[in-house]
Amino acid sequence: MIVGHRALVAYGREDGRYDVYYSHWGGADLALARQLADPATDPVADEPLSRAVEFAAVVGQYLDPLVHEALFVVDDEPRVYRTLWFGFGGGVDSSVDESSAGGLLVGVDWTDPCDDAHVRAWFAGARAVAAACHKRGELSQTMAATVVERALRDWADDREVIRPPATSGTGRTTGR
C-alpha cells in the first residue's frame, strides 16, 4: 500500500504573509525542501488552500500535527519544521484532552537527513516515557504534553519549537 507523506508549504509574500499549499509527497524524508530550494522548479503547482495568511494562521488553522508530517516555509531560504504528534490517550482520563491533542513543530536542518532522524528519535523516546506515565495515571494528557514540550525546548538548544493550538484532527483549531 502506498501512502502519501502530507505536508504544508507556506510561500512567503512581499507583504509578509503566506500562500498556503498542500503537498501529498515529500513530508517523510523532507525531499520536497530540495525542490523548493531550486528556483527553476515549481513542485507545488496546484491552487493554494489560502492566500495572504499570517504565519500564526498557517500554524493554527491549516496545520494538523496528526495529518501533516512537515511544514515547509519558503522565504529567502526554505525552512523546514518536523511535525511531532503527541498521540496520548488510553490512560485514566481516556477522553481526548484538547490541550494535548496536537503536537509540536521543531525546526530541522533539511540538508542533513541525520538531523531529522535525530529529532524524531529523541521525540519518540520522550513521548514513550510520558505516555507510559499517562497510562499508569501518573500524568494527565495535558501534563504529559507539557513535560514533553518543556524537555524538547531544553534539549533543542537553538532550534525553533512551536506549539500549534490543539486541533480536532481536521486541520482546524478546536475552539482556541
Model region roles, listed by residue range:
Residues 1-176:
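Acidic, polar-rich N-terminal leader regions of halophilic archaeal proteins
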